[in-house]
Amino acid sequence: MSQGKIVQIIGAVVDVEFQRNEVPKVYHALKVEGTAITLEVQQQLGDGVVRTIALGSTDGLKRNLLATNTERAISVPVGAGTLGRIMDVLGRPIDEAGDVQASDHWEIHRAAPSYEDQSSSTELLETGIKVIDLMCPFAKGGKVGLFGGAGVGKTVNMMELINNIAKAHSGLSVFAGVGERTREGNDFYHEMKDSNVLDKVAMVYGQMNEPPGNRLRVALTGLTMAEYFRDEKDASGKGKDVLLFVDNIYRYTLAGTEVSALLGRMPSAVGYQPTLAEEMGVLQERITSTKSGSITSIQAVYVPADDLTDPSPATTFAHLDSTVTLSRNIASLGIYPAVDPLDSTSRQMDPLVIGHEHYDTAQRVQQTLQKYKELKDIIAILGMDELSEEDKQSVSRARKIERFFSQPFHVAEVFTGSPGKYVSLKDTIRGFKAICDGEYDHLPEQAFYMVGSIEEAVEKANKMSAKA
């Protein structure tokens, strides 16, 4: 193994000089002697000098320290030994529970599966969240994005999805915390522990306080662990179905921007790295299902200043099967989850995939909400009395639908005091179909707020009339 010496340190960027005939390849990992720091080669500058990004704090590094070329990319532990553990970007345990007992180590830079190995599925993944199941259903083995600005509930929605899917799902889950709050990572660990599913979850964290190199690579570390579970065949020749949760994809892009600036690349639109589309593609193309197993991924995507045309969320859109858009306007009405049913999409929205009843109900709900949206200006200027009877009925049903989309979450029980509700897809379709048919026109709209199934809304209305 060749050795070089550090010649320059600028923040997280470290230049290392090697003999000209022993220059490491791009993405090879270097170990710095006397420290726990790993460097990843990003550029070859010529004359035997390589420019690297430090995966860890560069405090205490100095010139002329020796760096050894490991002659391979960063490798992380994979397999059953990672389950129930919290690891950093290099696969080192950070949960103070001893070493990770891994059967194998895989490099984090890998090629995406070939076209002939990939497979697509039209099987629906029920989430128990009414607005998602009805308006933007998820596919098993698909990619889902939760888009939203600051404070509209991306992480809470993701935690509820983990609660509803990962606990009911008998397969394995991998959670990659990319540049998010350490507190949320801690909460997630205890949530999994309390619900006895910790032994089915591998957790990889590169949080807000870590250098950009860690935040840029931690998503790849988590993905590599998920790929192992998908590709490693059991006795029957099948891999596993894996859930991959990434919170937050925007921080992955942001870390790429920081690294790009540190490496001296010319920024492109809004200051992002010129390689934004390529970096996103490298990650997203690997998150796919093969003939042996599947990866279903749910990714939170922060939307800077609520602008969906920002290059980062706009680049992410192209890779997803379902997009769940969280709206600040809906959150301001106190309707949670604050999903915008008119702005959320799904490739599964096809009568041949989800069935005619589901498709027709979703279309009717969408038309009713769209009509209400168009009438809002008239109502604001002239008031409800100026509307025709038909329009009044549409507005009344739309307001009931809006409120019926709200739902108490299991993960928010501690804040709200009301028990969480899981609503099956069948009950969801039945409830919204009945509202559109006018079966509940006589009930007050408050009865539909924060309930589970339609029966609970009727019960709530009866209680309200009894009190009155």
Curated annotation (Swiss-Prot):
Gene Ontology CC terms: plasma membrane; proton-transporting ATP synthase complex
EC number: 7.1.2.2
Catalytic activity from the UniProt record: ATP + H2O + 4 H(+)(in) = ADP + phosphate + 5 H(+)(out)
GO molecular function: ATP binding; ATP hydrolysis activity; proton-transporting ATP synthase activity, rotational mechanism
Subcellular location: Cell inner membrane
EC supergroup of this enzyme: translocase
Pfam family for this entry, one: ATP-synt_ab_N
InterPro entries: AAA+_ATPase, ATP-synt_VA_C, ATP_synth_F1_bsu, ATPase_a/bsu_AS, ATPase_alpha/beta_chains, ATPase_F1/V1/A1_a/bsu_N, ATPase_F1/V1/A1_a/bsu_N_sf, ATPase_F1/V1/A1_a/bsu_nucl-bd
Record's keyword terms, sorted: ATP synthesis, ATP-binding, Cell inner membrane, Cell membrane, CF(1), Hydrogen ion transport, Ion transport, Membrane, Nucleotide-binding, Translocase, Transport
Membrane-spanning segments: none
Annotated positions binding ATP: 148-155
Topological type in the membrane: Peripheral membrane protein
UniProt similarity note: Belongs to the ATPase alpha/beta chains family.
Protein task: Produces ATP from ADP in the presence of a proton gradient across the membrane. The catalytic sites are hosted primarily by the beta subunits.
Assembly information from the UniProt record: F-type ATPases have 2 components, CF(1) - the catalytic core - and CF(0) - the membrane proton channel. CF(1) has five subunits: alpha(3), beta(3), gamma(1), delta(1), epsilon(1). CF(0) has three main subunits: a(1), b(2) and c(9-12). The alpha and beta chains form an alternating ring which encloses part of the gamma chain. CF(1) is attached to CF(0) by a central stalk formed by the gamma and epsilon chains, while a peripheral stalk is formed by the delta and b chains.
NCBIfam families: atpD (TIGR01039)
The protein's name: ATP synthase subunit beta
